[in-house]
Each structure stands twice: as C-alpha cells, then as structure tokens.
C-alpha cells in the first residue's frame, strides 16, 4: 500500500513502476488516474470525502467515467476517511482486495419544455437543472431543489410569455459526468448559435447557508446580476468561476451562464442518506424562484439582449481543461 497525496511530479518521483502496489489517493482526478495507469498500479483506493470523518459515513459506488477509461482500466475501490486514516496510522503495508462489480447499459432521458417568445426571433435562453441523484441518497437538496426551482420558473414564464424563446431542460445523469447536458449540447449544435444564455440551478433552498451566484461571461454580466440582486433585495455572493454542473457544456460551447444556488459547509449532506426534505426551507426556495424570475426576466424581456454571447479567454481555457472540447 502506498499513499500518494496529490498528482504532482514531486509526489511521483521515484515511482515509475507501481506494479503490485495498491495506491491510496486523496482525490482521483483524471490526471492522477492517468499517472497510475501509466505507472501500472495494481489498484486504486479512493477516499470517500475529506468532509466526512465518521466511521459510518456513506460510501458511494465507484463509477468510472469514459474520459478516465480511455487511459485504461484499473480496479478501483472507495473507503471512508476514518478507515483510510486507520490504515496509514497503523502502518498497513499489505492488502488483500476483492473486487465485485457489474457492468450494464442504461438509458437516461432529458425532459425538455419550450416556451415560445412573443416576438419573432431565433434567440433563446436555456434554464437547466439535473433531476437525478446518486444511488444512496434521497436527493432533496441535490438536486430535487433545483428541479423544483426550474418547474416554478417554467410555470411563471408559461403564464407570462417572455419576448424571447425559452427552453427548460431537466437533465439526466448529471452525477455520472454531466451526461444529460453534454448529450443535449451535442445533439443541438444547430441551435446553439442562437442560445444567448444558460441559467442553471443545482442545490437551492437549504435552511442553513447563504445564496451564491456563479457566472461565466462578459464583464458586464456581473454588473447586471448585482443590479438585479440589489433591486430585488436578494443578498448573495456573486463570483466568476467554473462550476461542475449542467451549465458547463453550454459554457464550453460559448454560451454565458449564470448559476444561482444556496448552501453552506454546515449543510454538506449531498450524496448521503441525510439529504432529505427536512434540510430544505420552502420559504428560501420560494425566495430563490422569485429572485430568479426577476433575474431571467431582465434578460429574456430586454428589447436588445443586454450582453454579448462570449466567454472570456481565461475562463474558456479553464473550461477546456476541466471538461474537454466545445462539443463534449
């Protein structure tokens, strides 16, 4: 057994051949996985999460995504942080590992509703949320809350048609690697040049925490989002960063994105059996939908679309590094 904390050249110095070695890693990114395949590691042991240091912490099944498997297949296991620390503390040197797995093909669906605008235009705005969860969790916060928020927004704009067209997309299989949103972007290349923005909702309405709005787009976008927050009396952090959610494939295709959410380190129960409805505040979810109605309305009802359809070069480079080419 060998513990490799990170995928830096220094951490791998002198470890050109890991044959017969099970490698314990803090986080299994694609770069780390590729290094271990190329160095012929016998197996990989990932740590469930460094946030949950309990002996009974939930364990998610290990799922290998296609972008990992293109480098080769390695037996991969997951242990709790409690057990990982115990192995290192006790000086475990030899392990016996037994792998039980099943391979299967499943079908996932996106659910799409279109609201046609009142003015003749090809321009449209996407509103997205993933409706799936992980296999061990009820998924109230992640992402039943975002699913419900988009339904509330759909009902509003269905009854109050906007100037521009809108597509409400409930994406499947986000937790398996943004598969639903990637498939949608890949299948609708002819529509994307007319897509002016994407608003994505992933985890909203938690009782504890604060509102967060991440965005990727031209500099003017931040000013406009802050303006709507101020006018609506909606306190929120507003920051430019790349979020790993269904907005990413749209951003990779050059579409500016805005991602309202709500949460805090005290409410990090996603991907566990504790992600239940009692962590959700109907009032906070309603406030998010009311604010987002105003925010989206600011853009879809403007006489001329307020921002350019562009992604800053530095953000585009980060997107390509994390998520791959523009057509995922």
Predicted regions and their residues:
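Soluble metallo-hydrolase cores and metallopeptidase-like ectodomains found primarily
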Residues: 1-10, 62-140, 152-155, 159, ...
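Extracellular/luminal Protease-associated
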Residues: 1-75, 236
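Second-shell loop/turn segments in exported
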Residues: 3, 20-27, 32, 72-74, ...
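His/Asp/Glu-rich mid-to-C-terminal helical/loop segments that flank catalytic regions of hydrolases
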Residues: 155, 267-328
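Solvent-exposed loop/turn segments at secondary-structure junctions
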Residues: 28-31, 49-53, 83-84, 102-105, ...
């Amino acid at each position: 057994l060998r513990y490799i904390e990170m995928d830096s050249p220094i951490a791998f110095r002198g470890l050109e051949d890991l044959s017969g070695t099970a490698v314990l890693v803090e986080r299994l990114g694609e770069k780390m996985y590729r290094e271990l395949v190329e160095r012929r590691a016998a197996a990989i042991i990932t740590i469930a999460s460094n946030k949950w240091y309990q002996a009974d912490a939930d364990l998610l099944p290990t799922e290998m995504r296609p972008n990992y498997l293109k480098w080769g297949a390695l037996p991969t296991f997951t242990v709790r942080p409690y057990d990982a620390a115990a192995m290192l503390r006790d000086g475990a040197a030899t392990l016996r590992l037994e792998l039980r797995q099943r391979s299967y093909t499943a079908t996932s669906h996106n659910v799409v509703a279109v609201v046609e605008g009142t003015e003749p235009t090809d321009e449209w705005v996407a509103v997205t949320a993933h409706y799936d969860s992980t296999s061990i969790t009820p998924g109230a916060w992640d992402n039943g809350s975002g699913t419900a928020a988009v339904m509330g927004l759909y009902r509003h704009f269905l009854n109050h048609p906007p100037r521009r067209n809108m597509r409400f997309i409930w994406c499947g299989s986000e937790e398996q690697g943004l598969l639903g949103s990637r498939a949608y972007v890949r299948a609708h290349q002819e529509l994307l040049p007319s897509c002016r923005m994407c608003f994505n909702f992933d985890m909203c309405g938690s009782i504890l925490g604060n509102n967060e709005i991440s965005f990727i787009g031209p500099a003017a976008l931040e000013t406009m989002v802050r303006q709507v927050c101020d006018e609506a009396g909606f306190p929120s952090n507003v920051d430019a960063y790349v979020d790993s959610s269904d907005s990413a494939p749209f951003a990779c295709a050059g579409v500016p994105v805005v991602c309202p959410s709500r949460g805090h380190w005290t409410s990090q129960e996603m991907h566990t059996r504790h992600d239940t409805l009692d962590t959700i505040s109907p009032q906070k979810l309603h406030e998010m939908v009311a604010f987002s109605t105003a925010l989206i309305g600011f853009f879809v009802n403007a006489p001329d679309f307020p921002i350019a359809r562009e992604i800053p070069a530095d953000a585009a480079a980060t997107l390509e590094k994390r998520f791959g080419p523009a057509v995922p």
